[in-house]
Amino acid sequence: MGDPPPSQAGAAGAGVDLRATEVSLQKIAVWASVSLIAGTAGMLPLDAFDGTGTSTRQIDLPTWMEDPAGDGYGYGDWAYQVLASEMLRGNAVGIIAARGPRGLPTQIVMQHPDEIGVRRDPTTGEVEWRVAGTQIPTSDIWHQRAYPMPGRIQGLSPIGHHAATIGLGLNVLRFGNQFFEDGGHPTAILKTTASLNETAARVAKTRFLAAVSGRREPVVLGGDWEYQAIQIAPEESQFLETHKLTSIECCRIFGPGLAEVLGYETGGALTYQNIQERNIQLLIYALDPWLVRLERALSAMLPRGQYVRINRGALLRTDILTRYRAYQLAIRNRIQAPSEARELEDLPPLTPEQQAEFDSLPSPAPTSDSGGSRA
């Protein structure tokens, strides 16, 4: 028995079929959330380590991890596919195309989530995977799930679980297009004090439209006629309010804080400090759970004792003055070596001549934020 497919939108989102993964991305808030998390994760650098505790040492990242799919598009492209699949369908499935000497995967080609089929044989209990209708040996399947549920092979699909909310949001957009482009309401009223039957009213309307069609000249009306334009604010149809609410809810499907970071829910002036706080909020509440899943998946493909860490510091990169003060504090308290600070700034090691220049300079006086004390 397999897992249930993603459902169609409920009553609120009637007419919207979300069974195709790309349909949900038509909702801008869904697209923005997926793009922000998957895109950001793919841009953050990877570091590999060996050992634990005081014996931990950084090692070279395996060359295959620079392009896990082996298609030339690189790690960032591959990571985007993994996280986008997990965020939209709750699962990321790839085919293991190559293995290393220890039998660990060294090439994984991601598959479109809508082409994946899986079932558990009720007699043998074995799991059967199919990709685009072709059965694939379970040993060749690489599967990661974001929302695991007891008794299910695949994780919950966020899009299927929240189909009504996303469907409502798409219907609101469709209504908005019709409202503003097709004229979802009459644009004006042509009134007269005379009594008109249906035929006379139709003739008057036709003649008026013929008089104003394609012209910018003023229209002359008799004393018995009055033209009144209808101006309906979009708020009166609850278009913007509903659009805003569904956008906020769509963002929250993928993590708290995304609605605020993407600007769907705001409050107060946006300052540099607020931007820094938002980056931290994004990392802690929305992005980090996805980064941890990706780290664990990558670490599982390394020999025992080795693991991968995604460098989150690149996301929280501050202004140059703040960074230099942080380096000074870390170096004075022997948390970080000067060479490490230079490496973080993409600077080469000091040459002997540069080192001599530094040695000839007087020692700087301790500062209030140095964390140390005077000798």
Task: Give a label for each model feature.
Residues 1-239, 243-245, 249-252, 264-267, ...:
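Structured, contiguous alpha/beta core segments that scaffold functional sites
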Residues 220, 258-270, 297-304:
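Short acidic alpha-helical/loop segments enriched in Asp/Glu that coordinate divalent cations
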Residues 281:
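Glycine-rich and small/hydrophobic secondary-structure elements
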Residues 284-330:
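C-terminal hydrophobic structural anchor segments
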